[in-house]
Amino acid sequence: MEERIIESETRQCKAIFPGTLNANETLFGGQAMQWMDEVAYITATRFTRKKMFTVSTDNIKFLKTVSPGMFAEIVGKVEKVGSVKLHVKIEIWAEEMYGTERYKAIEGTFIFASLDENLKPQRL
């Protein structure tokens, strides 16, 4: 199982442009959560190779702001495997485009389940 966890780790990089900002001119939290859910979904699907559905999120923390002119790397890794639910840890790392500063800006857990054709949970 450890090998599957390693192989399913997913990384996606985004540039922070004006269209992703909020009224305070930092990364909009809703945009960040959309990116997190997408990477979590890809991670869960790569791990299980089944149709996965987001069940819930847990403990999303906005640790530091992300400014325009930065990169955001979204990293997903399987954290816990249950009989029907899968927990994916997501971190967003902010990185200067033209410098060396890099820091963890946002983190959270996304919980997924695989559902059958009747939308009932099925074993992973």
Predicted regions and their residues:
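Generic hydrophobic-segment detector
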Residues: 15, 19-20, 59, 66, ...
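Hot-dog-fold acyl-thioester-processing enzymes
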Residues: 1-53, 113-124
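HotDog/MaoC-like acyl-thioester-processing domains
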Residues: 3-12, 67-68, 79-124
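Small beta-barrel nucleic-acid-binding modules, principally OB-folds
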Residues: 49-65
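Generic preference for hydrophobic/aromatic residues in regular secondary structure cores
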Residues: 52-54, 70, 105
